[in-house]
UniProtKB/Swiss-Prot annotation:
HAMAP family listed in its UniProt record: Spermidine_synth
GO-annotated molecular function: spermidine synthase activity
GO BP, one annotated term: spermidine biosynthetic process
Lineage of source species: Bacteria, Pseudomonadati, Pseudomonadota, Gammaproteobacteria, Enterobacterales
Name recorded for this polypeptide: Polyamine aminopropyltransferase
NCBIfam families: MFS_SpdSyn, PRK00811.1, speE
EC numbers, comma separated: 2.5.1.16
Pathway field: Amine and polyamine biosynthesis; spermidine biosynthesis; spermidine from putrescine: step 1/1
Residues that, per the record, bind spermidine: H64, D88, D158, C159, T160, D161
InterPro entries for this protein: PABS, PABS_CS, SAM-dependent_MTases_sf, Spermi_synthase, Spermidine_synt_N, Spermidine_synt_N_sf
Pfam families hit by this protein: Spermine_synt_N, Spermine_synth
Gene name tied to this protein: speE
């Protein structure tokens, strides 16, 4: 791709978004997908896989803070964390901020993503790959959760959309495997798309997760790069109380963790579980 051109996201057939490409840093087909990293004056460095924006320097903090701090602070004493995907390292960066976490395992199907992101998205990982608690496993996520002998307190599925290599991370086989290696009282979260435009994705995840967990729901955040409205995150656990903790408990855990965030705070934590009525209605109709 030439510089000073427009890059078109191809996630949706009938509409989409464009980014001006100021400088192409990397563009190559890895073993699994087409990967491009380019610079844009408004959003900084942008990474896309198979024509779909995955992350940008400008707003990645919203996504990654909400995917990590919500489940980790709701759990309260997570020691072992599993990240599925997350090759750009930003999810890992946020998990390493929790000093009570003892082990962090990241399973990424594409070694190329990790290598390229270490070089071209250094602000995302911020040196977190060198954290002594971290272990990288190059494997398919479904295979890992169904074969591992490890167990985890929090599982974060930083999956792409349910197309290409990421499709398997929206299957019953994956959710069943996550339940298998999740400790009692543990929490599973996953990105579930922009519910206004990808409602079927959320409904499908809710239906499948409900076979394995007694408390299944969603929380949300507005992330500019993910076009079309609020992004939903799937939430699944067998401890229904964790979704309804008092603001005092979350506030105390937040301060004890010593976190200083750019988006997440205890008030956002509580508000994130308030969902639009159209999603409630769609879930009730299933």
């Amino acid at each position: 791709m030439a510089e000073n051109t427009m890059w078109h996201e191809t996630l949706h057939d009938q509409f989409g978004q464009y980014f001006a490409v100021d400088n192409v840093l990397y563009h190559e087909k890895t073993d699994h997908q087409d990967l491009i990293i380019f610079e844009n004056a408004a959003f900084g460095r942008v990474m896309a896989l198979d024509g779909v924006v995955q992350t940008t320097e400008r707003d990645e903090f919203i996504y990654h803070e909400m995917m990590t701090h919500v489940p980790l602070l709701a759990h309260g004493h997570a020691k072992h964390v599993l990240i599925i995907g997350g090759g750009d390292g930003a999810m890992l960066r946020e998990v390493t901020r929790h000093k009570n976490v003892e082990t962090i395992t990241m399973v990424e199907i594409d070694a190329g993503v990790v290598s390229f992101c270490r070089q071209y998205l250094p602000n995302h990982n911020a040196g977190s790959y060198d954290d002594p608690r971290f272990t990288l496993v190059i494997d398919d996520g479904v295979n890992f959760v169904n074969q591992t002998h490890q167990t985890f307190d929090v599982i974060i599925s930083d999956c792409t959309d349910p197309i290409g290599p990421g499709e398997s991370l929206f299957t019953s086989a994956f959710y069943e495997g996550c339940k298998r290696c999740l400790n009692p009282g543990g929490i599973f979260v996953a990105q579930n798309g922009v519910c206004f435009l990808q409602q079927d994705e959320a409904l499908d995840s809710h239906r499948k997760l409900s076979h394995y967990f007694s408390d299944v729901g969603f929380y949300q955040a507005a992330i500019p790069t993910y076009y079309g409205g609020i992004m939903t995150f799937a939430w699944a656990t067998d401890n229904g109380a964790l979704r309804h903790l008092s603001s005092e408990i979350i506030q105390a855990r937040f301060h004890a963790a010593g976190l200083k965030c750019r988006y997440y705070n205890p008030a956002i934590h509580a508000a994130a579980f308030a969902l639009p009525q159209y999603l409630h209605d769609a879930l009730s109709a299933q």
